Amino acid sequence: NIGWHALILATGAQERFLPFPGWTLPHVMGPGGLQLLVRSGWPVAGQRVVVAGTGPLLLDTALYLTRHGARVTDILEQAPRRALWSLAVRLARLAPATVWRALGVPRSRLRRRVRPGCWPVAAHGTDRVESVTVTDGSRTWTRDCDYLACAFGLVPSLQWPLLLGCRIEAEAVWVDAWQRTSLPRVYCAGEATGIAGVDCAVVQGEIAGLAAAGQEKAAERLFGARARQQRLAEALQKTFQLRRELLTLATDETVICRCEDV
């Protein structure tokens, strides 16, 4: 047993998967999952990879895989082009450093590979994925690939908060201004309280740590920084909200739960 005066939960997030025909084929996985495999030494040099879904993680994954020799043929972002341009304008005001980092990506690479307003509708193959069918809502086409890295954003990891009995609201852990949960002396920080990115998670962690140590006045001085990061998170959530078509990709034959084969 480990005794404690205060408990701070920082359980993070996990990738959101939406079922579509062929999504259980080998070599169809989340972008974050494929990155973890590559970090562990999994070879992807020369392999054709389609990265698909929504959110900033797609581009990060594509650049990471490219640096390790993979041939990223497409980056399919389901958000429409106009939403991405609107986000870029807002980021220039809220987080200019983020825009400069994005501008550091070779423009020719972006032009060739990023496809806004597109999403996968089916993966095909026998022993592993061999191709993916893509649509932009009006036409469809097929791309050959060795890997399909696909996830539709992130969702809070709530297993531990649920086991402890923390109050959950809007699919995230409820916290007050000092990151306190509904349970006495239990705090929560980061993506478990809502997807807001690493910078917001760091500030939330500092607030939770100070509050747990009884330094609430010091924690209050970080409220402004947290509010700025949360405004940025709201802009990202609005941009990358899922289109309705993604919820109807599964057919009667599509396996919804691969563990139970349902």
Stretches found by the model and what they are:
Residues 2-12, 144-153:
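Short hydrophobic core segments
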Residues 11-23, 154-165:
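Flavin (primarily FAD) binding-site architecture
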Residues 13-50, 54-61, 169-178:
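Glycine-rich dinucleotide-binding loop and its adjacent helix/turn
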Residues 29-38, 121, 128, 147-196:
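FAD-site-proximal beta/loop scaffold in flavoenzymes
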Residues 66-159, 167-170:
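A Rossmann-like FAD-binding core segment of flavoenzymes
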Residues 189-225:
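A conserved FAD-binding loop/helix module that cradles the flavin
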Residues 218-250:
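Long, charged amphipathic helices and adjacent flexible linkers at domain junctions
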Residues 245-262:
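C-terminal accessory/binding modules appended to enzymatic or scaffolding proteins
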